[in-house]
Amino acid sequence: MNTMENKIIKSKKAQVSLEFSFLFLAILLASIITISHFLSQNFTKDDKVISDVENAAKTAVILANSGYNGINPNVTLIYGGISWSGNKKNIYIYISPKSYITPEIKNFIVSYIYNVTKINQSEYNITVNP
């Protein structure tokens, strides 16, 4: 092979590689747009708030168990879960054992959730062990 044929072969390989890269980029972009559209259509602001509240509630229970802010529950508190009303504006946090959840612990958990998540207190009502 002479040098001219080598240049043509290398040029074709480079062009195929470039075309493949553009095709891959187009497919990737279309996938990202589709996923983004799906998520924006199926998850609302309220869903994000509930997720944030759940994470903050778990952290608040861990902090309460560690004696944070002078809280002494005398037992290990267990985060039991979260539920919400149909309109997702009333959020309920379940912690056990219920008999050891004092008003001080409830207030700490609710205050911690509002402070960390920065959600509007007049829009969302958080209750511990309803």
Curated annotation (Swiss-Prot):
One annotated Gene Ontology cellular component of this protein: cell surface
Q: Which domain of life is it from?
A: Archaea
Record-linked InterPro entries: Class3_signal_pept_motif
Statement: the UniProt record of this protein carries the keyword Electron transport: no
Q: Where is the signal peptide?
A: none
Instruction: From the Swiss-Prot or TrEMBL record, state where the protein is found.
Output: Secreted; Cell surface; Fimbrium
The known PTMs are summarized as:
The N-terminus is cleaved by the prepilin peptidase EppA, which recognizes the class III signal sequence.
Q: Major place of localization?
A: secreted
Motif QXSXEXXXL: list the residue ranges.
15-23
Presence of keyword Secreted? yes
Q: Which residues form the propeptide?
A: 1-14
Q: List the keywords (alphabetical).
A: Fimbrium, Secreted
**Domain notes for this protein:** Contains an amino terminal motif QXSXEXXXL, which is part of a class III signal sequence.
- Would you tell me the protein name for this molecule? Probable pilin MJ0835.1
Instruction: Give the species this sequence originates from.
Output: Methanocaldococcus jannaschii (strain ATCC 43067 / DSM 2661 / JAL-1 / JCM 10045 / NBRC 100440)
